[in-house]
């Protein structure tokens, strides 16, 4: 399921969802528009990880080739495999290159703008990654967020709201 419109976010909120994960392809302007249309809805935004050659929630290659649904969190990352490009005459134009692999998303320098646009939490891709990768990426984002929180008291860490 990809969530990229205010109407879809509003529908999910009214159906009982209490946070909505937005499609990773959205721009700052699109995130802000959704937030302005649905200010009561907490919005989770992808900030780090793979970008799909398809739109989020619209890839069926993994399911067709490997029986693993990307739309259920089981992407086989077919687009990350090397391919050769051969013309109609059989001539190899490109051999064993990552033709479908996009650059990974890294929004670490845009965290403050994402907060200003209405993001309430951030999603770092960790599925199918090893523990040290997830630990290091999360720590780097944590440092950047802590620096923002120190400068911008209007942003409060969710954990600081929990009282035991």
Language-model region placement:
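Catalytic alpha/beta core domains of metabolic enzymes, predominantly
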Residues: 1-128, 134-137, 144-149
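Carbohydrate-binding surfaces of carbohydrate-active enzymes
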Residues: 146-159
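Conserved small/polar residues in nucleotide/adenosyl-binding loops
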Residues: 162-164
């Amino acid at each position: 399921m990809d969530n990229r419109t205010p109407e879809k976010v509003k529908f999910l909120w009214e159906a009982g969802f209490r946070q909505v994960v937005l499609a990773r392809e959205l721009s700052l302007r699109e995130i802000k528009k959704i937030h302005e249309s649905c200010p009561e809805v907490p919005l989770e935004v992808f900030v780090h990880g793979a970008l799909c050659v398809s739109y989020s929630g619209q890839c069926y290659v993994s399911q067709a080739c490997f029986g693993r649904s990307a739309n259920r969190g089981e992407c086989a990352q077919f687009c990350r495999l090397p391919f050769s490009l051969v013309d109609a005459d059989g001539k190899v134009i490109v051999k064993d290159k990552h033709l479908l692999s996009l650059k990974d998303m890294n929004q670490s320098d845009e965290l403050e703008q994402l907060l200003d646009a209405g993001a309430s939490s951030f999603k770092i891709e960790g599925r199918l990654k090893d523990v040290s990768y997830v630990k290091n990426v999360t720590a780097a984002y944590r440092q950047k967020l802590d620096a923002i929180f120190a400068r911008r008291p209007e942003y409060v860490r969710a954990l600081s709201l929990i009282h035991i």
